[in-house]
């Protein structure tokens, strides 16, 4: 947690923000993103919401702050993030409205009116895409709403990309796989799920990554004191630059 606390924004959100004007702070851009995810289809009183992939709880806490009559369950497979979110739930007195659950989504049971999935699909792995959508259908109530934010790769690049291991898969997210827009449309259609694209955020992701890289380098001495090497610094800078270049 300490590593990410040094260079992420105040909400500790490790996914793209949404820059409407380009002049927002990183924290403001993350809150824009949260608002965009629910705009036009806001949670209703009494909704029981599931978030798959809690991170440090920023989206779940945002929802609870805006909608006082909902409940949220959020899943994680990170013990550190579980401990962090659990402590914050107690600190904010939200035990009756929010649960953080240390569990793989494939093992979870329940019925939810809304399910959110923010930049976790990339880590599912192509061999589990159908398993993932099967589970979403099982957990979602009839007429429920499923919303996700994911990184995609151009349709024309997908087949070549899927046949090899790139830098991200080797060093950052082993087993990960980006979908393409056509692949997402296909799997949504096969699973009888509605599909629409709300926001395309390539420029926002570029800005997010550039701010992360700036923050990382400004805080490097503190990060180094946590036990990270100069070799790690070079690798992390390459990772952030590699990704930001991909969104330009």
PLM regions with names:
Residues 65-106:
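Class I SAM-dependent methyltransferase SAM/SAH-binding core
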Residues 1-40:
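Conserved Class I S-adenosyl-L-methionine-dependent methyltransferase catalytic core
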Residues 106-115:
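A short acidic, Gly/Pro-enriched loop at the edge of an enzyme's catalytic core
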Residues 152-248:
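Substrate-binding/catalytic lobe of Class I Rossmann-like enzymes that use SAM or dcSAM, i.e.
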Residues 56-68:
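Conserved SAM-binding loop of SAM-dependent methyltransferases across substrates and taxa
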Residues 45-55:
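Conserved class I S-adenosyl-L-methionine
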Residues 130-142:
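A short glycine-rich, Lys/Arg-flanked "PGG" loop and its adjoining helix->strand segment in the class I
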Residues 143-151:
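Conserved beta-strand signature within the Rossmann-like core of class I S-adenosyl-L-methionine
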């Amino acid at each position: 947690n300490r590593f990410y606390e040094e260079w992420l924004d105040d909400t500790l959100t490790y996914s793209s923000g949404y820059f409407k004007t380009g002049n927002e702070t990183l924290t403001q851009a993350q809150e824009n993103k949260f608002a965009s995810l629910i705009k036009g289809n806001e949670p209703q009183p009494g909704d029981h919401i599931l978030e798959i992939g809690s991170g440090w709880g920023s989206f779940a806490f945002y929802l609870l702050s805006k909608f006082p009559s909902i409940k949220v369950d959020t899943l994680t497979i990170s013990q550190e993030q579980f401990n962090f979110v659990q402590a914050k739930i107690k600190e904010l007195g939200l035990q009756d409205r929010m649960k953080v659950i240390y569990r793989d989504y494939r093992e979870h049971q329940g019925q939810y009116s809304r399910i959110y999935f923010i930049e976790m699909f990339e880590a599912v792995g192509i061999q589990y895409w159908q398993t993932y959508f099967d589970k979403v259908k099982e957990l979602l109530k009839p007429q429920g709403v499923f919303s996700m934010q994911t990184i995609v790769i151009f349709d024309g690049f997908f087949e070549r990309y899927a046949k090899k291991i790139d830098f991200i898969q080797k060093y950052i997210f082993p087993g990960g796989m980006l979908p393409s827009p056509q692949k997402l449309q296909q799997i949504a259609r096969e699973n009888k799920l509605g599909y629409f694209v709300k926001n395309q955020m390539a420029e926002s992701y570029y800005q997010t990554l550039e701010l992360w890289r700036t923050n990382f380098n400004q805080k490097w001495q503190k990060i180094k004191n946590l036990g990270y090497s100069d070799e790690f610094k070079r690798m992390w800078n390459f990772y952030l630059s590699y990704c930001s270049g991909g969104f330009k």
